[in-house]
Amino acid sequence: MVLNINSFYKNCRGEFMRAVFIYHKNNQRMEKFYKNLLNEPDFCRICDDCYNCRGNWTFKNNVKNIVIEEVYEEFVDNPYDYLPELPEGDICIAQLHEDLLYELPLLLKEKGYKALIVPSETPHDLSLALRRDLKRVCSNYNIEFENPKPFCSLEKKEGNEYINKFIDYFKIGKPELEIEVENGLIKDVKVKISAPCGETYYIAKRLKGKAIDDLKEEIANAHHNYPCLASMEMDKELGDTILHKAGYIAFEVVEKALKK
């Protein structure tokens, strides 16, 4: 499969960032990450009293998704039977069969990508061994690499020039909020950075008008109702479920905003 979309992009690094999502068919988590950045009118329909709390922005001219067929084999002899030709870009966000992931950095290097992000939403999305290999291979190609577990744990790091720009540009990663309190009640909440799935906008809406003492229950309910799509399976590395880790992050960012 060849995607002839390079002319769609401006080659204006620093002023125009290009992100490409690549994942297998039926990957609902990656589909949600991608569609969050499109911000189409029907993306979020969770509230009956919708007043478009997300706003009228879109990154439809900055993002593309490449959906490839599912791989059922445990080992893939020729990953290039599945991997398509990639468009040029800056950042690649990928969830793929591990044999395909291992070959991906070379393709990214050839197309001028500066970073690879492989989010883990289940304990099986990326093995620790392949994480080490990808980090090494990407380093050899001068490609930044991160494996956030979950995606909403992605935050800026020293040395990650392009991933830091990705967070600033698309306003996704570890959430950041600005909260205004009046007489013990939440008067207003502004989303500075959203979780990649878009949940932060829903949490912000749910918090408005609530008493500070009631926030813990409100955040927990919002996290499960949105819903968070992270796995409920125990992750050995975390010693907890990734769903719970995402929930802890949601609590943490609200507490941090209240202290400012």
UniProtKB/Swiss-Prot annotation:
Keywords: Methyltransferase, Nucleotide biosynthesis, Transferase. Pathway: Pyrimidine metabolism; dTTP biosynthesis. GO terms for molecular function: thymidylate synthase activity. It holds the Pfam family DUF166. It comes from the Archaea. The keyword Transcription does not apply. Its EC number is 2.1.1.-. The keyword Methyltransferase applies. One of its GO terms (biological process) is methylation. Is able to catalyze the biosynthesis of dTMP using dUMP, tetrahydrofolate and formaldehyde in vitro, i.e. a reaction equivalent to that catalyzed by bacterial thymidylate synthases (EC 2.1.1.45). However, M.jannaschii like most methanogenic Archaea lacks folates, thus the physiological cosubstrate is unknown but is likely one of the non-methylated methanopterin biosynthetic intermediates. This is Thymidylate synthase.
